[in-house]
């Protein structure tokens, strides 16, 4: 069996990726989130597949088909809430995964990092389209507001919006195509994740020190398989607790009201994982400027390899940049809070200041602190 594992064309690939993969001996639990994201994707695809068997993508029956899933289908409520809260777990793991990459300088592997940025955009697009499907008030108005942003594109904007809608407003055609895209995108995400892994295994993983670890590597199995299983058990336990005790904790009560184009909810807001980007969008009084800032809030990650000025890779020995990093984390939490607040004083000002700080830290302060730390190293 050992020989077959190393000689069989298909098993050989699996062996080199998950069994005999040389892995740095010092990587911490912060490296668990890649495997957790894979598990989240599997949970989402499997629960989504069962939901799609009972869901109908028609404006007249979409809301009642979701109600039917929860009330009449065996364990339909469980599948539905696993899917909804699984998305939240997905984004928690995604943000922690990106945060770890930022802290330990994983963006130095440019190919892996850029595929990761594309993956993040794809996951966000998938989650947005999934939120539209239950056809509640927040689904409808969220879809209307976000798709309308494309009308800010000069000259071709309004045409693109009508093309996406399949008419002159968000309606049956929009819901049907969003369902089609929401179904296919997770498989594209799975393919991109394989490309992400392919590029990662070309270079090997980094480690907390940011130094070369070729002299000190251990096989992935059993050491890191056990570690990943522990991480998976913790994550699944948290997900099950969330689903069984407070399944609507992260949702919006407005989405339990069927979509009504004649009645606008008092506060239109997306799911919690988009609130930071939504706050950045709202903080700019110009429509096109807001859309550009919204896209840049994620696309800025692709610039990180070019903004790296330090002679060290990781932040572990860089106290000034460490302080900036944690200010950035706090700033993102403030933006998330602001995104859920109404557009009124003082929230508008706080949102604008937090948005300026977000871009300033990444584009100005972090590269400057890298240069300052290089100078300090020369003195000692």
UniProtKB/Swiss-Prot annotation:
GO BP terms in the entry: mitochondrial electron transport, ubiquinol to cytochrome c
Residues noted as binding a ubiquinone in the record, renumbered to the chain: 201
Q: Name one GO cellular component term.
A: mitochondrial inner membrane
Tell me a Gene Ontology molecular-function term this record carries.
Answer: metal ion binding
Q: Which residues cross the membrane?
A: 33-53, 77-98, 113-133, 178-198, 226-246, 288-308, 320-340, 347-367
Cofactor(s) recorded in Swiss-Prot or TrEMBL: heme b
Keyword Zinc present in the record's keywords: the answer is no
One Pfam family in the UniProt entry: Cytochrom_B_C
Q: Which UniProt keywords apply?
A: Electron transport, Heme, Iron, Membrane, Metal-binding, Mitochondrion, Mitochondrion inner membrane, Respiratory chain, Transmembrane, Transmembrane helix, Transport, Ubiquinone
**Quaternary structure annotation from Swiss-Prot or TrEMBL:** The cytochrome bc1 complex contains 11 subunits: 3 respiratory subunits (MT-CYB, CYC1 and UQCRFS1), 2 core proteins (UQCRC1 and UQCRC2) and 6 low-molecular weight proteins (UQCRH/QCR6, UQCRB/QCR7, UQCRQ/QCR8, UQCR10/QCR9, UQCR11/QCR10 and a cleavage product of UQCRFS1). This cytochrome bc1 complex then forms a dimer.
| Similarity section | Belongs to the cytochrome b family.
Name of this chain's protein: Cytochrome b
């Amino acid at each position: 069996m050992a020989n077959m594992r190393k000689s069989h064309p298909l098993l050989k690939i699996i062996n080199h990726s998950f069994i005999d993969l040389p892995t740095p001996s010092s990587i911490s639990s912060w490296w668990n989130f890649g495997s957790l994201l894979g598990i989240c994707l599997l949970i989402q695809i499997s629960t989504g597949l069962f939901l799609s068997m009972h869901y109908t993508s028609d404006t007249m029956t979409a809301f009642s088909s979701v109600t039917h899933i929860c009330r009449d289908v065996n364990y339909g409520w469980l599948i539905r809430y696993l899917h909804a809260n699984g998305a939240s777990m997905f984004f928690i793991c995604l943000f922690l995964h990106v945060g770890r990459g930022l802290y330990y300088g994983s963006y130095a592997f440019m190919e892996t990092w850029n595929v990761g940025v594309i993956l993040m955009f794809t996951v966000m697009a998938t989650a947005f389209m999934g939120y539209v499907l239950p056809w509640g008030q927040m689904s409808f108005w969220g879809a209307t507001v976000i798709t309308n942003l494309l009308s800010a594109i000069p000259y071709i904007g309004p045409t693109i919006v009508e093309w996406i809608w399949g008419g002159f407003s968000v309606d049956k055609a929009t819901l049907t195509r969003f369902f089609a895209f929401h179904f296919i995108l997770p498989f594209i995400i799975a393919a991109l994740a394989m490309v992400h892994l392919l590029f990662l295994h070309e270079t090997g993983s980094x480690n907390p020190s940011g130094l070369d670890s070729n002299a000190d590597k251990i096989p992935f199995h059993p050491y890191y398989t056990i570690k990943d299983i522990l991480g998976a058990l913790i994550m699944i336990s948290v997900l099950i607790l969330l689903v069984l005790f407070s399944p609507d904790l992260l949702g919006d009560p407005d989405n339990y009201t069927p979509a009504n184009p004649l009645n606008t909810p008092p506060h239109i807001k997306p799911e919690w994982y988009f609130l930071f980007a939504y706050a950045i969008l709202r903080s700019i009084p110009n429509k096109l400027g807001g859309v550009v800032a919204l896209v840049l809030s994620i696309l800025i990650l692709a610039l990180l390899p070019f903004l790296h000025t330090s002679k060290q890779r990781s932040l572990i020995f860089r106290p000034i940049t460490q302080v900036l990093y944690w200010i950035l984390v706090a700033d993102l939490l403030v933006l998330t809070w602001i995104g859920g607040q109404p557009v009124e004083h003082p929230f508008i000002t706080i949102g604008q200041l937090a948005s300026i700080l977000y871009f300033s830290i990444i584009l100005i302060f972090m590269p400057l602190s890298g240069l300052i730390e290089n100078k300090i190293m020369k003195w000692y």
